[in-house]
Amino acid sequence: MCIRDRIEDNPKMILKEKKNCSMGVAMQMVADGRADAMISAGSTAALVMGGTLIVKRIKGVKRPSLTPVMPGLNNMYILLDGGANVDCRPDMLRQFAVMGSVYMNKIMGVDNPKVGLLNVGAEEEKGRELEQETYALLKNSTLNFTGNVEARNAALGEVDVVVTDGFTGNIYLKTVEGMGKFMKASLKKIFFRNLGTKIGAMFTMKGIKEISKQMDYRETGGSPVSYTHLTLPTKLEV
């Protein structure tokens, strides 16, 4: 089922004043068991809010998480949180790590996914109080926690799950999107500079297109909302 609402609509308006809008109806269908999933091109805030209030969270899950699938050097990886929660506590990030591990294992088929905590350095003592306390929780968990991961290394295959708060995660996500556009525009500018570079481009065009496609965020085009029965098992150790 493909659902589309005007993205400029206010989240509360969609859920309260427009109870019969496509997004609200679709969520109720999922909640009632008449649909197994829904896809929306509407307001992200309304989708997250409606999912929490209508579809409901798995018992024990504190906050939802936007979980974009990101392009990596040798494999795809996921980011939690991509922007649903600006302010997070360490226990929430631990839950994001659990949800991300389950998603990578059950949906992406990755055995024992590697979890990394997005930070300003790889050392254990790096970061704010949030990262330091989260590090301790993940270190003592049963997850395959590999430690802190710097933004520059996240896409190089070091981890399968990148965990951070929604504020940092959204900046990271949009930076990656922007770099993809920058690289595509830069390559085009370089290869079409003169006749010699145009001839060179003819021999490398296939590779350039592959790189551009890999870096294009439209290849994924959306993000699962991790917290409900839509994406996770009904029993979850959190």
Spans of features found by a protein language model:
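Short glycine/serine/threonine-rich phosphate/pyrophosphate-binding segments
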Residues: 22-23, 44-51, 127, 171-172
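Glycine-rich phosphate/diphosphate-binding loop of Rossmann-like nucleotide-binding domains
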Residues: 87-147
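Glycine-rich phosphate/nucleotide-binding loop
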Residues: 55-63, 71-79, 158-162, 166-232
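Flexible, glycine/charged-enriched surface loops at secondary-structure junctions
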Residues: 107-115, 144-152, 193-202, 217-223
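A glycine- and small-aliphatic-rich helix-loop capping segment at beta-alpha/alpha-beta transitions
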Residues: 46, 50-67, 133-138, 181-182
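Short, glycine-/small-residue-rich phosphate/pyrophosphate-handling segment
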Residues: 71-104, 218-222
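Phosphate/nucleotide-donor binding subsite
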Residues: 4-35
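Conserved small/polar residues in nucleotide/adenosyl-binding loops
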Residues: 1-5, 228-234
